[in-house]
């Protein structure tokens, strides 16, 4: 049984699978302040033996998670961006500097869609990454997420109160103006990047992240929403790890330890 962890800037998303390549048995999310709640989740799945995760929240939280996993007898692996892995080639000037969440999302998108795509992850920050038809990561954008944009206005503008607003074509109050402006800024960045993929007919915009629904309806491009793309990418990595750990069989297939069967 395998635990997948996407440790982001605000939340920890988790998924439990029976084995690599199988559907989710359970999944959910915790805030950073709720990190110790992961102990109860792990305790509910006593057969857990492995963890594959992405952590962009820093060493302190990673160390706390490592301690919990060690206590539970779970072997953990935090992924790192590579130069070429799982059908994706890393075009970053320094491949190791690419965020592990972006790397896992690119791998998940490649498995989902074999053609050219934009991988848009909207959370605390928004990333807009271009993956071409050959699996080459061509680069991407990082911009403040909607809530960071809103908070920046509130922190740096005198007399401005943050109130819930709605996205409208022609806002006529401050709350709607802020929400609409921030959402349209996100959509504009996505569409500007997507224009570089045109006229490739099979180009797709893969949307993920908790803030994506706040601007998805503004997009005029072909989109495909995915709730937890980083976890999907981690599942691909976990499956490859499992395959690599199986000893070769004389027939050329791989023998999976534990049951003697050839798969």
UniProtKB/Swiss-Prot annotation:
**Pfam families documented for this protein:** Pan_kinase
Residues binding ATP, per UniProt: 6-13, 124
Which pathway does UniProt place it in? Cofactor biosynthesis; coenzyme A biosynthesis; CoA from (R)-pantothenate: step 1/5
Instruction: From the UniProt record, list the reaction(s) this protein catalyses.
Output: (R)-pantothenate + ATP = (R)-4'-phosphopantothenate + ADP + H(+)
Give me any GO biological process, just one: coenzyme A biosynthetic process
Q: How does it assemble?
A: Homodimer.
Protein name, UniProt field = Type III pantothenate kinase
The entry sums up its family as follows: Belongs to the type III pantothenate kinase family.
Primary role: Catalyzes the phosphorylation of pantothenate (Pan), the first step in CoA biosynthesis.
| Cofactor(s), names only, from the UniProt record | NH4(+); K(+)
Recorded GO terms, molecular function?
Answer: ATP binding; pantothenate kinase activity
Q: How is the cofactor bound?
A: A monovalent cation. Ammonium or potassium.
Database matches in SUPFAM superfamilies: Actin-like ATPase domain
The active site lies at: 101
Stated EC number for the protein is: 2.7.1.33
The record lists the organism as Azoarcus sp. (strain BH72)
Cell compartment(s), UniProt: Cytoplasm
């Amino acid at each position: 049984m395998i635990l997948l962890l996407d440790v982001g800037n605000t939340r920890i998303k988790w998924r439990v699978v029976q084995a690599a390549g199988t559907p989710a048995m359970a999944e959910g999310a915790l805030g950073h302040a709720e990190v110790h709640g992961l102990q109860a989740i792990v305790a509910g799945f006593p057969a857990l033996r492995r963890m594959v995760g992405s952590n962009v929240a820093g060493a302190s939280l990673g160390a706390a998670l490592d301690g919990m996993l060690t206590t539970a007898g779970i072997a953990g692996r935090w992924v790192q961006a590579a130069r070429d892995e799982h059908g994706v080639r890393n075009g970053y000037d320094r491949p190791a500097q690419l965020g592990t969440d972006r790397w896992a999302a690119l791998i998940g998108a490649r498995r989902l869609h074999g053609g050219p795509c934009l991988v848009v992850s909207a959370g605390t920050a928004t990333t807009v990454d271009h993956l071409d038809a050959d699996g080459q990561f061509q680069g991407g954008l990082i911009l403040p997420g909607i809530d960071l944009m809103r908070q920046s206005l509130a922190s740096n503008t005198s007399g401005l109160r943050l109130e819930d607003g709605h996205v409208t074509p022609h806002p006529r109050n401050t709350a709607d103006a802020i929400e609409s402006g921030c959402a349209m800024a996100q959509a504009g960045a996505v569409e500007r990047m997507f224009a570089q993929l045109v006229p490739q007919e099979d180009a797709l915009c893969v949307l993920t992240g908790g803030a994506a629904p706040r601007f998805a309806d503004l997009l005029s491009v072909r989109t495909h929403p995915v709730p937890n793309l980083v976890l999907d990418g981690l599942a691909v990595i976990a499956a490859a790890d499992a395959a690599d750990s199986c000893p070769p069989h004389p027939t050329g297939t791989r023998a999976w330890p534990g049951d003697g069967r050839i798969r």
